[in-house]
Curated annotation (Swiss-Prot):
UniProt-recorded name of the protein: Cysteine desulfurase IscS
Functional pathway: Cofactor biosynthesis; iron-sulfur cluster biosynthesis
Binding site residues for [2Fe-2S] cluster: 328
Keyword Membrane carried by entry: no
SUPFAM superfamilies xrefs: PLP-dependent transferases (SSF53383)
Source organism: Vibrio atlanticus (strain LGP32) (Vibrio splendidus (strain Mel32))
Major localization listed first in the record, in broad terms: cytoplasm
Gene Ontology biological process terms in this record: [2Fe-2S] cluster assembly
Gene name tied to this protein: iscS
Subunit structure: Homodimer. Forms a heterotetramer with IscU, interacts with other sulfur acceptors.
Length: 404
C-alpha cells in the first residue's frame, strides 16, 4: 500500500492508464501530432478525425449530437463561456440571472462580474441538506430572467440537484438553463434528450482524463446562442478560438468512453467504500455528515468532527491526502462558504474534512484510513478543554467567553 493514500478524487483524478496510452499516440513524429485545422494534408486530416471521434465519445455520454460539443480548457472556461456568453447575447431580453450560494467559484465569480456590468443576480439559499427548494427557485424567476445556473453535483458535499425538474421550470418560461457538471459527468447518468438543459460544463480530469481540457455542451434544438469570450481563428464554430489540443481531446474522449462503459461498476465500488468508511467512523460521537446522504454521489463523504480543528486534523492525518474545504479555496483559513450556506456554524465548518475516492481506491486503504482517523480524532479531543466541557454536559452556546 502506497502512502500517503489518495482520498482527494473530487479535486482531481489520476489519468487512467488506458487514457494515457491513447494520448501518447498523439504527440510524437511517428504518431498523430498534426493540427486538426490543417486541411491541406494527411497529418491534419488524421488529427481532425481523432478530434471528431472524441467529440462523438463525449456526445455519446450525454446522448447528445457531436455538433453540440465545444472544446475548452476546462470546466472553469466552460462556465465562463456559458454564463457570460449567454448573458451578453440575450441581455436585450433581460438582465436577471439566478444561481445558488453553494456553486463553485467558477460560476459565482462570473456572476459577480455580470453584476459589475449592470446585471442583477439572485443567489438562492439551499436547504440544510444542500438541496435547492424548487418553490424558492420558481419564486425567484421573473419576466427579465435570462439565465439560471445550477450545478449538478456539489464539489464539496457531493449532493445531487434535481436537474430534470429545474429544467422543466426553465423551459416553461423560456429561460436558458446552464449546469456545471464537472463533478457528475462520467459518474452518474446525464441525458440531454430527457433533461431540458441548454448548457453543460464538463471537465476531463474529474473523470480520469487529463487536466487542461474540458467541454461545453451547447444545445442546437432549441438553438442556444452565445457571445464568444475567446477570439482568434474562429475554431469550434466561432464559440472558442484556439488550436485544438489533439492529445488532450483524445484523452478526454477516451476517459468519457471508459466512464460510460464502467459507470455502474465505478458507482457500486465507490458506494461500498463510502459505506465502509462511514461505518468505521460514525460511532466517534459528535460526527456530522454534511449534505444529504441519499441524494448524493457515492464518491464523496464530507464529515465534521465536532471539537476538532480541521487544520489540526489534516496535519494529524499526514498519511491521508484529504481536503478541508475545496481545493480551489482551501489555501485560505476561512470556513467553507458551502458549509456556511447549509447553516453550519464556524466551528463545525472548520472541523470538516472531505474524503473523496474513486476507481483506484481499495478496501485496505479505507481500513487504514479508519484506524488513522479514530486515533487522530480521539487524540485531538483529549487535548481540547471544549470537549471536556461538552462531555460534562455544558451547553457551549450559553458560555460567555471573556474577551482579552
Amino acid at each position: 500500500m502506497k502512502l500517503p493514500i489518495y482520498f482527494d478524487y473530487s479535486a482531481t483524478c489520476p489519468v487512467d492508464p488506458r487514457v494515457a496510452e491513447k494520448m501518447v499516440q498523439c504527440m510524437t513524429m511517428d504518431g498523430n501530432f498534426g493540427n486538426p485545422a490543417s486541411r491541406s494534408h494527411r497529418y491534419g486530416w488524421q488529427a481532425e478525425e481523432s478530434v471528431d471521434n472524441a467529440r462523438e465519445q463525449i456526445a455519446d455520454l450525454l446522448n447528445a449530437d457531436p455538433r453540440e460539443i465545444v472544446f475548452t480548457s476546462g470546466a472553469t472556461e466552460s462556465d465562463n463561456l456559458a454564463i457570460k456568453g449567454a448573458a451578453h447575447f440575450y441581455e436585450k431580453k433581460g438582465k436577471h440571472v439566478i444561481t445558488c450560494k453553494t456553486e463553485h467559484k467558477a460560476v459565482l465569480d462570473p456572476c459577480r462580474q455580470l453584476e459589475r456590468e449592470g446585471f442583477e443576480v439572485t443567489y438562492l439559499e439551499p436547504e440544510a441538506n444542500g438541496i435547492i427548494d424548487l418553490d424558492k427557485l420558481q419564486a425567484a424567476m421573473r419576466e427579465d430572467t435570462v439565465l439560471v445556473s445550477i450545478m449538478h453535483v456539489n464539489n464539496e458535499i457531493g449532493v445531487i440537484q434535481d436537474i430534470g425538474a429545474i429544467g422543466e421550470l426553465c423551459r416553461a418560461r423560456k429561460i436558458i438553463f446552464h449546469v456545471d457538471a464537472a463533478q457528475s459527468a462520467g459518474k452518474i447518468p446525464l441525458d440531454v434528450k430527457e433533461m431540458k438543459v441548454d448548457l453543460i460544463s464538463m471537465s476531463a480530469h474529474k473523470a480520469y482524463g487529463p487536466k487542461g481540457i474540458g467541454a461545453l455542451y451547447v444545445r442546437r434544438k432549441p438553438r442556444i446562442r452565445l457571445e464568444a469570450q475567446m477570439h482568434g481563428g474562429g475554431h469550434e464554430r466561432g464559440f472558442r478560438s484556439g488550436t485544438l489540443a489533439t492529445h488532450q481531446i483524445v484523452g478526454m474522449g477516451e476517459a468519457f468512453a471508459i466512464a460510460k462503459q464502467d459507470m455502474q461498476k465505478d458507482y457500486d465500488h465507490a458506494l461500498a467504500l463510502r459505506e465502509r468508511l462511514l461505518k468505521g467512523v460514525q460511532d466517534l460521537e459528535a460526527v456530522t455528515v454534511n449534505g444529504d446522504l441519499d441524494q448524493r454521489v457515492p464518491h464523496n463523504l464530507n464529515v465534521s468532527f465536532a471539537f476538532v480543528e480541521g487544520e489540526s486534523l489534516l496535519m494529524s492525518l499526514k498519511d491521508l491526502a484529504v481536503s478541508s474545504g475545496s481545493a480551489c479555496t482551501s489555501a485560505s483559513l476561512e470556513p467553507s462558504y458551502v458549509l456556511r450556506a447549509l447553516g453550519l456554524n464556524d466551528e463545525l465548518a472548520h472541523s470538516s474534512v472531505r474524503f473523496s475516492f474513486g476507481r483506484f481506491t481499495t478496501e485496505e486503504e479505507i481500513d487504514y484510513a479508519i484506524a488513522q482517523i479514530r486515533v487522530a480524532v480521539n487524540k485531538l479531543r483529549d487535548m481540547s478543554p471544549l470537549w471536556d466541557m461538552y462531555k460534562e454536559g455544558i451547553d457551549l452556546n450559553t458560555v460567555e467567553w471573556a474577551h482579552h
